[in-house]
């Protein structure tokens, strides 16, 4: 299938983007447009695959786990490109690129790309709009999670106050972008449900967790407006709620019959659980490494660097 082939090629372009970004960590002279170019090509290939699959289905391809993961990775690729187009931070960009790679890799290597008929309940004009709003909001929140994690780490270390200010502003902008889309996602979801099932609310677990996610970011915006320190922690709490909404509720028996549940019957449970635990495991390791770095005297770090340069 051509769309599956294009998504596979896009996956490797995202990998090239990650590798060149890691190179930039040690060789800053390499322009950031190289990994950004790979990211843009990957996103463009995914958009082409999306249109091809739409032409085959005669409907928006956002109804199976494979299609949702491909669409999410496309949104994450766009979020990475536009976030780091002006904000040149190789380490942050590398951490953010892991998100579309993980999403697309899961789709390609664990989910079936076969075309499946769209059930009547999903054939609503509101459904593609609802999923698109949700996708773009979660993509912004995903990159925001990486930014907030690094911001919190720098604050705990007491380092780079100027960088802290820039990261705080970047995280706030990402939330300002994602929050309206998430709000529209809730509204269009209610319109879709009312149009398809004559009721805007079904007391569905995914509806509740999505509403909780909205509330978390609404609280963040309120705390930020009041200039309350520590509001950035809600970027991590919000990401936990996003992952719970996207993956976690799939393990709830009452949610498996819901139209909101995209998990495939053959999807390995451990892999889906990894979607929840993975980002926080990475965060824990990063914080531990930074804590170890803080205990190392700065003079020792400078001395080691001088010795290394002398041996070259």
Predicted regions and their residues:
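Hydrophobic cores of alpha-helical transmembrane segments in multi-pass integral membrane proteins
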Residues: 3-117, 132-154, 166-196, 202-312
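Low-complexity, intrinsically disordered or weakly predicted helical/coil tracts enriched
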Residues: 115-120, 161
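Acidic/Ser/Thr-rich, low-complexity mid-to-C-terminal regulatory regions of eukaryotic proteins
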Residues: 121-132
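Cytosolic, membrane-interface loops and tails of multi-pass inner-membrane proteins
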Residues: 158-165
